[in-house]
């Protein structure tokens, strides 16, 4: 294999990755489809209206639960990312021109689906003067204008930690500002060459300093050790991260990073317990957890925990 699905020549790293066959999944990597009434209604509506969600297009295993809770995730910024992470199925390349009408369409999709909570994520747009900050912020504004009772979680790239670009995004006031570090420092450069670990932590700190609820994600199975996971959890908590999700890496294709280990569910239980003990307000860990999984419930849990802490400290909520 020397050509990627999008027609470009494979990178040397991708050629090396492809030498390792796709791994066989362990028995605990499976889901049961529970198609409740809310899920069935949303499924029919999405098909009828021609709407697009990450949930369907990425084949997320949690779609049945999330749609039953009226939660969904949308991808903005196009189908090409200006950076390449070795675990990510989104293609790298020159993106299409900025679609300034996209925020309106996403907001209308949220309205049509009657969502209680929406997650918006997107590609890195280093080709744009503002890194795509306007697009992310405007999408939040449009959703809130059309859906005042819908929560919005915004999962952003790092915008190179540019203060002006970050401020433009923060001013849109999503319920949760998420930025995923994804892996531990020792293998970070190998897995995410376009990002920097400390820079990602700085983005989370900036969001927390702005007064936003913050969130991040760790993907296990790419070469880290359990001890490194705990150290990364400390780094995230010290940076001001309120919510963390921890998941198993599932390889999208042979050209992506091989799975180094299948993390047993018991280890996820240990990590969730540890993250809670060191002070995270919201934690979810498991083989099939994804960063947007049960996002609305995690946000509500975090707000309730913050309020309880304020009351116990004698503060006025």
Swiss-Prot record:
Single annotated GO MF: lipoate synthase activity
Span of domain Radical SAM core: 67-281
Protein name: Lipoyl synthase
Disulfide-bond pairs as recorded: none
Binding site for [4Fe-4S] cluster 2: 81, 85, 88
Gene: lipA
Species name: Mycolicibacterium gilvum (strain PYR-GCK)
Predominant cellular place of this UniProt entry's protein: cytoplasm
EC number(s) on file: 2.8.1.8
Matches recorded under PANTHER family: LIPOYL SYNTHASE, LIPOYL SYNTHASE, MITOCHONDRIAL
Cell compartments where the protein resides: Cytoplasm
Pathway note: Protein modification; protein lipoylation via endogenous pathway; protein N(6)-(lipoyl)lysine from octanoyl-[acyl-carrier-protein]: step 2/2
GO cellular component terms listed in the entry, alphabetical order: cytoplasm
List of residues binding [4Fe-4S] cluster 1: 55, 60, 66, 292
The organism's place on the tree of life at top rank: Bacteria
């Amino acid at each position: 294999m020397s050509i990627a699905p999008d027609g470009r020549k494979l990178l040397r790293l991708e050629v090396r990755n492809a030498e390792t066959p796709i791994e066989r999944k362990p028995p605990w990597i499976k889901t049961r489809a529970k198609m409740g009434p809310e899920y069935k209604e949303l499924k029919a509506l999405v098909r009828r209206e021609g709407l697009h969600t990450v949930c369907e297009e990425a084949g997320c295993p949690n779609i049945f639960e999330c749609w039953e809770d009226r939660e969904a995730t949308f991808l903005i910024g196009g189908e090409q990312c200006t950076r390449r992470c070795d675990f990510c199925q989104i293609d790298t390349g020159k993106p299409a021109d900025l679609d300034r009408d996209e925020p309106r369409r996403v907001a209308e999709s949220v309205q049509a689906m009657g969502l209680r909570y929406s997650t918006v994520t997107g590609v890195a747009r280093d080709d744009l003067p503002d890194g795509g900050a306007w697009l992310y912020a405007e999408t939040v504004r449009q959703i809130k204008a059309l859906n005042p009772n819908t929560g919005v979680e915004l999962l952003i790239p790092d915008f190179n930690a540019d203060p002006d670009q970050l401020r433009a995004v923060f001013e849109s006031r999503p319920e949760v500002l998420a930025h995923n570090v994804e892996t531990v420092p020792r293998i970070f450069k190998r897995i995410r060459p376009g990002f920097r670990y400390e820079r990602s932590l700085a983005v989370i700190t900036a969001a927390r300093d702005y007064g936003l609820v913050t969130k991040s994600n760790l993907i296990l199975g790419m070469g880290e050790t359990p001890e490194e996971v705990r150290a990364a959890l400390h780094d995230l908590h010290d940076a001001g991260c309120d919510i963390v999700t921890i998941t198993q890496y599932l390889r999208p294709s042979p050209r992506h990073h091989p799975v180094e280990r299948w993390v047993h569910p018991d280890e996820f239980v240990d990590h969730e317990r540890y993250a809670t003990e060191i002070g995270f307000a919201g934690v979810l860990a498991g083989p099939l957890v994804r960063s947007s999984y049960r996002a609305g419930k995690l946000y509500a849990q975090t707000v309730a925990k913050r309020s309880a802490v304020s009351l116990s400290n004698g503060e006025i909520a």
